[in-house]
Amino acid sequence: MSIDYSDMAFPKPARKKKKKHHKATILKSRKGICYLCARLNGDYRTKVTEEHHILFGSGRRERSEEAGLKVDLCIPHHRTGQQAAHNCREMRELLCRIAQREYEQTHTHEEWMALAGKNYL
């Protein structure tokens, strides 16, 4: 017993998901070089890096992407170390201060407040 599938509307044609094209980072961050290692220690060696969204959580990650508020961080500075951006409030706020300074060079303070909801300067 075989079924003729030729006149059935299946499988449905796959719909491609549209990719969002986000701005490049507004901070001077290069792929493979940890932003914090370079800024704090002068270490410009190539490392395994992960993209860190400076504003994250409750829909702010997408807005962070659109505004270019992201940097490449090595794994210890991103999630595992004592001074990791996800573990250390001082490091997270340092990144937010730097990002706010850069953002406000081309935008107003009111635009930053609408985006981030907090003043870090």
Label the model's feature ranges.
Residues 45-46, 61, 86:
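Short glycine-/acidic-enriched loop or helix-start segments at secondary-structure transitions
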Residues 70-94:
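Short Cys/His-centered divalent metal-binding micro-motifs
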Residues 21-22, 52-53, 77-78, 86, ...:
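Histidine (H) residue identity feature
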Residues 1-48, 93-121:
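A boundary/linker detector
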Residues 19-22, 58-59, 88:
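Residue-level detector of alpha-helix boundaries and kinks
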Residues 6, 26, 56-57, 81-82, ...:
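Alpha-helical and His/Cys-centered functional microenvironments
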Residues 55-70:
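Short linker/helix segments within small regulatory modules
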Residues 49-57, 74-81:
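Histidine-centered catalytic micro-motifs
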